[in-house]
Structures are given as structure tokens and as C-alpha cells.
Amino acid sequence: MSEEEEDDPQQQAELTSKQKQDIAKWFLTNSPPGEIHCIAKDIRSILSDEDAYNAAVSEAYPLYNKSHMICLELPNRTGDVLITTFGEIDEIEYLDPRTCQVATVNHVKQVCTNVRPATDEELPTSFIEEFRGALDAELVKYVAETYPKGSCSVYCISGKDVEGPGANFELAAVISASRHSPQNFCNGSWRSIWNIEFKDDLQVVELRGKLQVDAHYFEEGNVQLDANHECKDNTIFQSPEDCAVSITSMICHQENEYMASLEASYTNLPDTTFKDLRRKLPVTRTLFPWHNTLQFSLTRDIAKELGI
């Protein structure tokens, strides 16, 4: 085969429908906060393959919605539901522990289409609910004070059948906040997941946190922030109300510390990281003598060599 034939796009094998689907799915699942609809629209026009597009969308949207922990309003306006793996009952049903309701979700449209009461099997015992409800109440107050457009939820992810003291159980507290301002060319989100283990045998409560911050600025450029942080803390096992106050205080402290560290690192970015990216000396290891550039007259050197 000639070189011309190798470079000819017509001679190159086209992507299969499955390959197109996988590529489209990757772009959709990696969309910046609040931008998946716009990216889906562009992908649809580029693919020109409706089957591959529909397959990619049906797989990518649920993953994106759970990863970004999007918040959807319940159809009866009794509250909101966070789309998380902790509240996932099946592919389209998600539990809202606060209202004891299960929402049916259309992932692609990102709306709740139906709601039903949660069954007893889907809810924790009254003993666990005391701890879950107390923490949820404290977390709601913290999120309202800290995040202008934030939502939170607390789930029992282990030991929901525990009837009383003497056994261990685990809660998961999630916080999701986002700000979408495409007219100002910026979108961002904050997500934090807190696994809280109540160890009755040790009379201790252990906290493990995973924090993620995403931001996208795209005015006359394309700048993205993707920052992650993990942390741990612990407190003593107390009453539901006292545990809730202590846990929320630890969450507040850890999140404020991380935000302060982010602000400090990016404030110093121009004077540290960006400066280090520049080559301190050219490849000749000699500074260019800008004060005496006449000695580098190209015209004069050429004339001398040619004897002009």
C-alpha cells in the first residue's frame, strides 16, 4: 500500500458502532458539572449513529448522576432526593431516608417521575433511625449555613436491622452542592462522602471522609479543577443527639481545613508551580544579552560570509 493510500481517510477502517458507543460514554461520564446535556447534544450530532448514541446515553447518565450525586425534586414537592449509590434500590428507584419515600427517576431527563412510600424492609429499625435522624437534622443545619445550594442525606449502609445497644452499625452522610453559571462560563460542584462506623464494643465512632471538588472555567480558554482529599477522625460513642453534634462538628472542621488548604495552594500557584514550569535558562545555558542585540545582526553575518 502506498503512503498516499495509508493517509487517505477513505482507506482507513471506520469505527464500529460499539467503539463509537464506548467513546461517547467516556465523554458523557467525564462531563464537567452541569454540562452533560450540552455534551450529549454535541455527541449526537457528531456520531450520526442513533443506536450508538442511545446506548451510550442509557449507560452514561446513571453513572454520571450517581457520581455527581445530583439532587432532584420529588414530584409531590415534599422534598428532594439525592441520586447516590447508598440510596439506590434498583436502576431507577432511589430512597430518600428523610421523608421515607422512594423516587422513580428518569436518568436522562434528570427528573423524578413517581414516588411511593418506602417499605419496612427498605428502612432501618427505630433504634438506628434515632442516630440517623439526629445526624440528618444537624447536617441539614450545617449545609444550610455553609453551602448556598447544598443538599445532604444520611443513610444506614450496615446494621439497619440492629434493634438496640450491643451491636455495630454504619451510616453514610453525603453532601452535594453545585453552582451552574454557563452564562458566565463557569460551573462547579462540591461532593463529600462520610462513612461513620459506630463501634459499640469499643465505644468509639470512626469517621472516614472523601471530598471532591470540580470546577470548569471556559471563557476564552478551558481550565478545569479536579481535586480530591481523604481524611479520618473519631469521637466517643454517645447518645444519638450528642453523637450527631460531635460528628457534624468534625465534618465542619475537616471540610473547612480542606477548603482553606485549597485556597492557599491556588493563591500561591502563580508564584510557585507556574513559575517552575518556565525554563530558567535556554538550552545554551546562557542568558540572551538583550542589552546588546546588535552583535547578533543576522544580515551583517550573512553579508560577511557572502563577501557582499
List where the protein language model places each region.
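Amphipathic alpha-helical elements of HEAT/ARM-like alpha-solenoid repeat scaffolds that form extended
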Residues: 36-43, 75
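Surface-exposed short loop/turn segments
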Residues: 133, 137, 145, 150-224
